[in-house]
């Protein structure tokens, strides 16, 4: 058996979770995938720097002309599309070091997932995610947390304080 692609997770206080509300004028009054892509690019541009890498960009919710709670706005009509977006970033050096280790094992990273998100997906029921949950995962050296509401991931982070510092 040869493993050539690996999904890795990062648990580091260098993880940042930023929330944005991006407004995009709707061309031709009907929302297209291009309008949504433009909003994502605008959110990602606010996170571009030499020392950070974008791990994940996730939509949290859509609204058209002030009407909220739209699941999929493509094909709907309006003048202004607002998208709430979560952008997860990490220090570039951490991702480069992970990539180096994986490449030295003759494999490639297929996806990077942040630990707080992975913990939540592995442990939360759909009811818990829908009702709203803050999942706290305390390890020896770090404590990670993720926030879910209405079944949607909202925010995450990692604190450099773990069980070793408390007990």
Feature-to-residue mapping (PLM):
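Short beta-strand scaffold segments in enzyme catalytic cores
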Residues: 143-147
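Nucleotide/phosphate-binding catalytic cleft detector across ATP-hydrolyzing
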Residues: 1-135, 152-154, 163
């Amino acid at each position: 058996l040869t493993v050539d692609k690996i999904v890795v997770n990062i648990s580091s206080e260098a993880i940042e979770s930023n929330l944005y509300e991006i407004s995009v004028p709707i061309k031709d009054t009907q929302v297209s995938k291009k309008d949504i892509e433009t909003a994502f690019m605008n959110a990602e541009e606010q996170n571009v720097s030499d020392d950070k890498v974008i791990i994940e960009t996730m939509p949290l919710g859509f609204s058209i002309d002030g009407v909220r709670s739209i699941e999929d706005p493509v094909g709907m009509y309006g003048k202004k599309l607002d998208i709430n977006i979560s952008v997860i970033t990490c220090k570039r050096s951490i991702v480069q070091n992970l990539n180096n280790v994986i490449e030295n094992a003759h494999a490639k990273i297929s996806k990077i997932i942040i630990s707080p998100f992975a913990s939540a997906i592995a442990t939360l029921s759909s009811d818990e995610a829908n009702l709203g949950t803050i999942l706290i995962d305390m390890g020896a050296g770090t404590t990670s947390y993720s926030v879910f509401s209405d079944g949607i991931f909202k925010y995450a982070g990692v604190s450099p304080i773990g069980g070793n510092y408390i007990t």
